[in-house]
Amino acid sequence: GVPCAESCVWIPCTVTALLGCSCKDKVCYLD
């Protein structure tokens, strides 16, 4: 549930996705 400082409104999580972040409510989150 920690914001990863990357949005996913128009494109999916990219750099932060490699760290385990996923898209939730238009923002990339880690747990």
From Swiss-Prot:
Keywords: Disulfide bond, Knottin, Plant defense
The UniProt record lists the keyword tRNA-binding: no
SUPFAM superfamilies, alphabetized: Cyclotides (SSF57038)
One Pfam family from the record: Cyclotide
PTM info: Contains 3 disulfide bonds.
Leader sequence segment: none
InterPro entries per UniProt: Cyclotide, Cyclotide_bracelet_CS, Cyclotide_sf
One of the GO BP terms on file: defense response
Keyword Ribosomal protein: no
Purpose: Probably participates in a plant defense mechanism.
Record note on domains: The presence of a 'disulfide through disulfide knot' structurally defines this protein as a knottin.
Entry similarity comment: Belongs to the cyclotide family. Bracelet subfamily.
Protein name listed in UniProt: Cyclotide cter-C
Organism listed in the record: Clitoria ternatea
